[in-house]
Amino acid sequence: MKNTVKSLMAGLMATGCLIAYGVTWTHLETGGASVAEPHESVSAKNAEWSALQVGREIAGEDDWRGFNRFMFAVQDAAMDYIATPINHVYCSVLPKPVIRGVDNAIDNSEYPIRFVATLLRGEGGCAWDETKRFAVNTVLGIGGLFDPAKNWFGIFSTEASLSGTFATWGIPRGPSLVLPFVPRVHVRDCAGYILDQGLDPKTYIDFFFPTGIGIGWSAALWPNDLAMAIDPWNANIKSSVDPYEAYRRAIAAKTLLDEKLAVYHYMNELAANEKGTRRPPVRRPPQRPAGLKGRWWDIAGYKPRAPAIDTLRIRLFAPTRDNDFWWMRSSVFNGDFAKDVAMRTVAIAPGFQDARYGFVPAPAHSAPQQRKRLVFVIPGIGGECDSASALAMAELLHDAGASAVTLDNPFNWRYAISANRGILPGNLPEDARRLSAFMRAVIDDLSRNGLVDDAEVSVVGWSMGGLFVSYLAKLENDGELGFKVDTLLAVNPPVDFNYAISTIESFIEPSKSWSREQMLEKFVDVTPRLLVWDKIHFDSTPDISEEDARYTVAAFLAATLPELVTCVTGKESSVSPRDYLTGFVPDSARHVGMKTIEDVLRGNAHVSVIHTRDDFLLDADDRDFLDNTFGDRITWFSAGAHCGMFHTPEFKREVLARLKLIEE
């Protein structure tokens, strides 16, 4: 069981970065009726490798879909009704250091699996590394409770298994097969996992050293395994549009990485060359242009690399109270900021799902005037109200004394089937009207429940959320907003929706030349670099090329569109950004943007902008337009590309100043 849950956890922890590089999923089943059809290989039709196609190729066909979905439903129910209650109790009794120590010890005991797996694939050096790790961690790590092999000596685990060994022998993986709590999704890999258990000492220890309490050691240790897995499960699987496909594709991707020993090899590459081998040199940021009307910020110590690489730094923007040292997230004693955010719902219209939002009240110690401040947070395209960036912004506002409401972005699938009333977004003026109606409903809900009183409302949104802020300003100007607003702040908004879509499409375009083998090679090479950087934030930028960063950024921004179309229409879609614009957005709305409401933005003193001079979603005319339209109501950062400066103190201070939460 330990190996089961540990592998499951690893697969789910990888999911965030796998999404970013292109392993995503669509809603394959709506209303209980499957709509999935066999897919044509991308390489066969010379199309671009969309996020959906990458996920399909890695996970493969699902010939036993009915059986597999039933097995997944069994696992999902067990996680909800058995595992979750047990986990809450366990994590509230044992502190996180104890749970992690036990996890390390169990991992150390599984040395025979990794040793045999690497030896059978002819990787003698890997087998020797595993032997050294076992010896060091057993002696110096007090039976494996700690990991000095990695932390002191730079000896890394291969995470090898017999599933990967069978793959290197050329054994086909066979049909997709999902079994409850078996962290493999193909016949070959499930067989390898079962044989792994024969090499696991815990399989036999129960026979020789009974616990005396009616259950074996493996079962007694199961809650500890669960504690390490359930948070990633809830964050990456339960929150997806189709949890079954999310699970199947994430586990298939993790299995592929383990087969190639990808993370192990990259960690050794980093150890051999701490500065990495492909990181581009630091570039000189743009200098303040002559005659600039807006404010100007140079970010101390930012070290810009390349625009797409710098954009990935938005991953550094997360709540500061996000990793309680003593207690796991499931514990009643956990102090993470996310536990302070109440997830609420509000009815929008009959026949549609209630729309969700997050709410965190102002601190009790806030001044009376500050406690009246209520700030709505609208994340970027596809963003969720409980995403790391939305919560980080809410924490920033909360710590400044305000209450905060986090919303799903209107291009999010949950929002589309609730607050957007089942209408695909893209007609920005109409989308903004439905957004304002949702915001009015939220204000009424909070007032009705005594959570806010006579609130002074502000709004902050970034990327596509920033563009929606601009259209809320037009509604205010036309007297259609429905509530009084104090300040509206748009961060890194694209000026021209059509130009932004074209830029994203151009970033994905080079993938048309990739064969299937080249795509898999890129996936195995780039994903470990993102995974490792996501954990250690090495030098603040991931160790990937600008070309790969462009594809990563574009795949992430575009991944939400197939989900939207599938959820709303009930038919599986792999729509590209350009096809979405031409196929689902009315002709009259395709060229809307900030320039079409220039007079409103120029004359509305409530609206301000924060932007970067090197944002690839702007061209030279866009930058001139913003500077001339907003004047001293715009702040320019010298670097950061598209939202890649959010983690810096300079940006955080400017947000609070523009929202009038601190003095400028």
List where the protein language model places each region.
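Alpha/beta-hydrolase-fold enzymes
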Residues: 471-567
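Conserved alpha/beta-hydrolase "acid-adjacent" motif
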Residues: 592, 616-622
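N-terminal targeting leaders of membrane proteins
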Residues: 22-122, 214-284, 664
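Alpha/beta-hydrolase active-site loop
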Residues: 424-449
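Catalytic histidine-centered segment of alpha/beta-hydrolase-like enzymes
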Residues: 640-651
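N-terminal cap/lid segment of alpha/beta-hydrolase-fold proteins
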Residues: 294-370
